[in-house]
Amino acid sequence: MDFINHQLFIKDINVHIDPILPKKTAIITHGHADHARFGHDHVIATRQTIDIMKIRYGDKCAKKFTPLRYGQKYSIKNYDFTLYPAGHILGSAQVLIEKNNHRLVITGDYKVGKDETCKNFKLVKCDTLITEATFGLPIFQHPDPKDEIQKLIRSVKINKNNCHIVGAYALGKAQRVMNLLRQQKYNCLLYTSPSPRDVRSSRMPSSA
């Protein structure tokens, strides 16, 4: 595994993980735009991630797609690749790479907390771990999502005549906020900006 120009790259089989520029073969961990780009010859990813890419970039955003189920092994020469749930967003995956009895895991973006909008994180045994660390510092302590949603609902009840605007990424967090509201029996109408609405009303499956 090489790290060239801020990209993970397996040189002897010309395979990139989440490359930012068009490549011959790209394994995509999830559908967020900083990981999933258009223009690759061959994209390997979960079916949900491929669907998201097609919604965002069009059906011809790659020349070839290989959808993999979680736990399904895919081989390129003497390398074996298996995707496992990352718990980040719908279709997100960790990548297990096996060669000569060595197991390397690339996490991609991941979340270990429970989230009903995607398959939850699965711990994968490995010899080498390459991890995303967006919130890796100890100063990042995320509160319980249900407590935060309860704060929002209380505020709505207290301030009935005021509009409440919740900022969230269109893909992933917006769906999670809506799901958490419904879990807490908040059944009032929710208005969304165009981006989450376009994703929700598309052919994209609602669960992983």
Regions found by a protein language model. Name each.
Residues 2-10, 16-21, 25, 31-163, ...:
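His/Asp/Glu-rich metal-coordinating catalytic cores
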Residues 66-69, 189-193:
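Beta-strand->loop->alpha-helix junctions that form or flank phosphate-binding loops
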Residues 172-173, 197:
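Short, catalytically relevant binding-site loops at active-site mouths
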Residues 175-180:
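A short acidic (Asp/Glu
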Residues 183-189:
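Structural alpha-beta junctions
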Residues 191-208:
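Single conserved hydrophobic/aromatic residue that forms the stacking wall/gate
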